[in-house]
Amino acid sequence: MASERKTKLSKNLLRMKFMQRGLDSETKKQLEEEERKMISDEHWYLDLPELKEKESFIVEEQSFSLCEDLLYGRMSFRGFNPEVEKLMLQMNSKNRAEAAEEDETVEVDVSDEEMARRYETLVGTIGKKFVKKRDRANYEEDENGTIKAIKPKKMFLKPQD
């Protein structure tokens, strides 16, 4: 029986252009009918059950009191984003009073006088960095770190009339 059964070529192979030249009229008609079935509108219709529209879940509140104690949406903690933390402090009404209390309790690590002295020495040391080589010999450093000129810098003198 297996030897009597003739093997058939696949439909995809028969649709190829070079295979259609040698086909007889009966097989050509059969292929055309199958192609029509595939292209027909019924082929593109999905046999799925109709989907029900999702019911929206809406809750109506009579008052807006629930929205009064909400926090500002953008958040930052432990100085991760300082700009956002500033916005948080401004926008959150509860934190305004707390922020004022925190500002009052902040201790000053460096006094104003000490900061002024540090700034003076800093100006001197940074000034040294930008002095040219030939001018370094003309300047003298005090014990405080300030730089003073040994000789006054020569300047252009106007001729007298």
UniProtKB/Swiss-Prot annotation:
Gene Ontology biological-process annotations:
maturation of 5.8S rRNA
The entry's protein name is: M-phase phosphoprotein 6
Coarse class of the primary localization is nucleus
Per the Swiss-Prot or TrEMBL annotation, the motif Nuclear localization signal is positioned at 117-134
Compartments where located:
Nucleus, Nucleolus; Cytoplasm
- Keyword Ribonucleoprotein attributed: no
Taxonomic lineage is: Eukaryota, Metazoa, Chordata, Craniata, Vertebrata
Name its species.
Mus musculus
Question: Sites of the modification Phosphoserine?
Answer: 111
**Mind telling me where the Glycyl lysine isopeptide (Lys-Gly) (interchain with G-Cter in SUMO2) cross-link is?**
37, 86, 128, 151, 154
